[in-house]
Amino acid sequence: MDRDFLKGAAVLGIAGIIVKILGAVYRLPLSNIIKSEGMGYYQTAYPLYTLLLTISTAGFPIAIAKLVSERRAIGDYKNAFKVFKVALMGLFLGGVITSLFVLVQADNIVNRLGNSNAYYSLIALVPALFFVPIMAAFRGFYQGRQSMTPTALSQIVEQFFRVVVGLFLTYLLLDRGIPMAAGGASFGGSMGALAGLIVISIVYIRGRGTVKEELSLTKISDDYRVNQIIKDLLLISIPITIGASVVPIMDTIDLVIVLKQLQSIGYTEELANGLYGNLKGMASTLINLPQVLSVAIAISLVPAISRANARKNRREMEDIISSGIRITLLIGLPAALGLYALARPIIELLYYKNDMDTIINTAKLLSILSFGVIFLTLVQSLSAILQGLGRPIVPAVNLFVGAVAKVILSYTLTRIPQINIYGAAFSTVTAYGIASILDLISVKKYAKMKLDVMSVFIKPFISAVGMALLAFLSYSFLVARLGSKLSTVVAIVVGVILYAVLLLVTGSISSEDLGLLPKGDKLGKLVDKFKLIK
């Protein structure tokens, strides 16, 4: 069973990384097509969509999986399937209610937000609000059967169709105006959800014979009433939903505050939307890119720490925790300082179709948000560590504290004319900074350990500073000779090479650290063979 669990975790982990990469790559061409105006409309709809989906579905796949798994474990296949049917009907009704609510209220919602042109972006997501809850029921059912491939496959197909259909419709509708084109991008999410649902439904239909065979093998079956199933599902899913809702709630409140506060200090609806698009649709996209690697680390940490904790192997547990934090900083620090050092050149390289005002504003936002990469990647890994230690609620509480601080700062700072949209960026960095510090304190408390400050923090910091400094100097030297775009690419390559050298020189990384990365075991053996690491 342990092998099945690890295999399942690996399958979902790989799928999660693929989905993250597709999502990150999607935003870059999209931003160049609909620019900051369109990204403002798009990003007005998505936080609301994410929040509604989180509330209606977040905890249910896990709850369904838990109840199905428990019933199957005692041979009660009949009631295991009954759990799935009850959950499917409940999520179907939830999807109908949520999608109808947005369909009827979409115009009122965007007007209250102060961004009326976001109507098409929001209304285009209505089908997804219906399809995704149904898909969540199927995913929970298969996860309860220790079959993670259907979930992983549906996730990848969903994201692939979202990207392809979204970009296609954006191009197709561009002549109809930016609001309509942004709606086309949003509709890609609905088509992706439909594609994912179709795939997992096909898997279910093809496997119905196996399910029927299981039902005939039922050894024991008590009277598991529908109202009790609903109660059990809610008892498991509600706490999970509350924890998962922190970030969507934070983003939604941020959306409301930022747009309204900018308009209160004299910005028109269009200008406020454009600035919001610079923040959420362009600068924040780059901040999320390093998560592709930090998510992979987080996935590795949970089972590794849980296993060491279960064996009561304290030395192994402390080594894994230290390596997890160090390797996270080895990713987060250079990404943060590199984005800060080359903020303007990177924005000019990636968002070249936007006007100069947009590029300048987005570069300033990126220079502020770049420091958030350190805290955001830390929050992911530290949350995984706390989950491995059996404290899953703690990181959610810590993130909630950060979210409260973000709301207060966003409200206060964005209404100051000299600060405006930059206050929202600063509040985001502060929120994740607070959460990461609280998570770090919690890890030290529950793991009852001290971290080696030199190896975990100082050495990675020195290497990252050296990398960022040389990358900046390389760009400054080359820009007059090669132009901005080529100089940016060369500076990044130079920075990466120097960073690798500095890691080896300072002894910032060990072969054990590499084991937490995808294919890290093979990489660790390779560097040991050539004695690249001390």
What do the predicted segments below correspond to?
Residues 69-88, 275-370:
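Specific pore-lining/lateral-gate transmembrane helices of multi-pass inner-membrane transport
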Residues 115-137, 355-382:
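Alpha-helical transmembrane segments of multi-pass membrane proteins
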